[in-house]
Amino acid sequence: MHTGGEPLRIVTDGFPKPDGKTILQKRRFVKEKLDNFRKLLMHEPRGHYDMYGALLVEPDIEDADIAVLFMDNRSYSTMCGHAVIALGRYATDYGYVRPTEPETKVNIECPCGLVKALVEYKNGKSGSVRFQSVPAFVFATDVELNVQGHGKVKVDISYGGAFYAFISADKLGLDLWKTPINQIKDAATMVTNAVKNEVQLEHPDDNDLAFIYGTIVTDGKDEYSDEPTANICVFADAQVDRSPTGSGVTARTALQYHKRHISLNKSRVFVNARIGSKFSAKPVRQTKCGSYDAVIIEVSGHAFYTGKSAFTFEEDDPLKGGFLLK
């Protein structure tokens, strides 16, 4: 499937069953013991540098209809909004839930927590999906970093199921629409590396959630407007999201709410600056995450089917483990 151009390879069979009582334990087990399967599915020659995957596992939350581990070119994310949108349709269409009109509810257990998706359903066909995030919050604003090639810059850090750094393109001397994408990718990666080196992240629920997943370069238009606001997300190992980034839009909306640029139940459109794909998002209610003031964000988008595949490897294949070209 794809959501806004960002691929999602849903793994339904053939992957060894991960040990663990909780989804974070299963994530840790797959990361430590079964990572060769991620590389086989995500990397060339079966995948590519920017491939993204979702492994369906047994839920450990009673209310969950499905549970998922996310995977990318480097490791395993704790949340992925574009994947949740796709999985909402998939669960509705493949019998994980009973379809109901006008919307079908799908509870998806993610490593960051339970995410509730609502899938449009009419005349036997699923459509667009909206989901409500886990509590999203701002970790810090105006964090000064020493960024290789750019000197001292300030970023905001916000959580939307995963942690992201936010910076406007002009602060890096970039044009979000015209600068070659590799230059944006390199600059964003340097920002992410600086956060890793200089900022100690924390999450109230679990230390496994306390890592920087990527940097989102924006157009700087955070004041509320009916006009779309653009961004590009660079995550994992310099992977470029083709969609506006579901968890990133969640974190960015939480940041805008924190700065009083947007109010509850006001919807904003977010667009990928290069692909043109769009998500909409709105803060729907206040909450807490530990001691942090948090907000639940509702994100909407549409996913589409792209095909079915069965992957194999031969033992004598010298490249059976996969590879990446940088």
Curated annotation (Swiss-Prot):
Substrate binds at residues 81-82, 241, 246-247. Keywords: Lyase. One of its GO terms (molecular function) is trans-L-3-hydroxyproline dehydratase activity. It catalyses: trans-3-hydroxy-L-proline = 1-pyrroline-2-carboxylate + H2O. Its EC number is 4.2.1.77. Pfam families: Pro_racemase. The active site is at 80 (proton acceptor). Belongs to the proline racemase family. Catalyzes the dehydration of trans-3-hydroxy-L-proline to delta-1-pyrroline-2-carboxylate (Pyr2C). Homodimer. In contrast to the T.cruzi proline racemase enzyme, lacks the conserved Cys at position 245 which is replaced by a Thr residue, transforming the racemase activity into dehydratase activity. This is Trans-L-3-hydroxyproline dehydratase. The lineage of its organism: Eukaryota, Metazoa, Hemichordata, Enteropneusta, Harrimaniidae.
